[in-house]
């Protein structure tokens, strides 16, 4: 039914996408040709395609147990990262993406991971600070579905195609870069060039499906925040959570919020299916 899918970024809110996709995909027999994801949405698009949603959620929720802080001061004093979420994310990616699973994904669809390239000759710490600051400010003031501040600053969009990943390490580097939000997540390096969170250019990179839409092929964009209005673009459908998801993007101590996001995705997926059935009956 949909030839292209977009998984927007959103950190832990992206577990909503897992619940929605797992509910809707079997009923609609979704077999998209191209799937694009940014930040944690890029991970969500891949583990849902592999049918590993339950495993990922349980592993993450288990890792949250017993944690009272987002920071690891003891590890930091010994030379580790202050925010352990980045190392935890990398460890999970290394466990998930074997050579066999990469081959499975490459044979299934044209998956693309969105990253942002900072302006050339900018020191990376400056680029990260300005890019993330501009993104957050625009989000708070304008609440756009598609951000524009990053492009105006000179950030460039880039896509890493899974078919060009020769080994799991290439995919893991792309996923880490797509979620790169210092100091929470480390800066990325892809193709010997610096890379930051794909959401700094556009958190919902539907631009990567524009050629399909222009050719008359329908696409579906999975957002991770409730929105009151979306752009009206031919052949594009947006879906979003029906309420605010009570979990912060990078938290590693809120398993209840992660489960809530997933369960809300299931409910919203069922509501979406009912709306499609109602439209079909009205025709």
Which sequence ranges carry the predicted segments?
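Patatin-like phospholipase
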Residues: 1-38, 46-283
């Amino acid at each position: 039914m949909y030839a292209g899918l977009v998984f927007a970024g959103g950190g832990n809110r992206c577990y909503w996408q897992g619940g929605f996709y797992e509910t809707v995909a079997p009923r609609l027999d979704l077999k998209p040709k191209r799937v694009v994801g940014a930040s944690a949405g890029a991970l969500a698009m891949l583990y849902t395609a592999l049918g590993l949603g339950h495993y990922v959620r349980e592993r993450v929720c288990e890792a949250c147990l017993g944690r009272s802080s987002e920071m690891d001061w003891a590890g930091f004093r010994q030379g580790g990262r202050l925010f352990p979420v980045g190392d935890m994310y990398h460890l999970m990616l290394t466990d998930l993406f074997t050579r066999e699973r990469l081959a499975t994904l490459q044979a299934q669809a044209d998956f693309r991971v969105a990253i942002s390239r900072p302006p050339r000759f900018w020191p990376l710490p400056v680029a990260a600070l300005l890019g993330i600051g501009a993104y957050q400010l625009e989000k708070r003031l304008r609440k756009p579905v598609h951000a524009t501040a990053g492009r105006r600053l000179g950030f460039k969009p880039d896509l890493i195609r899974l078919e060009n990943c020769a080994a799991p390490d290439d995919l893991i580097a792309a996923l880490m870069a797509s979620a790169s939000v210092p100091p929470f997540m480390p800066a990325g390096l892809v193709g010997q060039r610096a890379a930051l969170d794909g959401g700094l250019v556009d958190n919902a990179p539907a631009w990567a499906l524009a050629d399909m839409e222009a050719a008359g092929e329908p696409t579906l964009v999975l957002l991770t925040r409730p929105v009151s209005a979306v752009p009206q673009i031919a052949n594009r459908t947006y879906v979003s959570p029906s309420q605010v998801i009570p979990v912060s993007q990078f938290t590693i101590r809120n398993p209840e919020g992660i489960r809530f996001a997933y369960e809300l995705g299931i409910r919203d997926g069922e509501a979406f299916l009912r709306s499609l059935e109602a439209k079909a009956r009205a025709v």
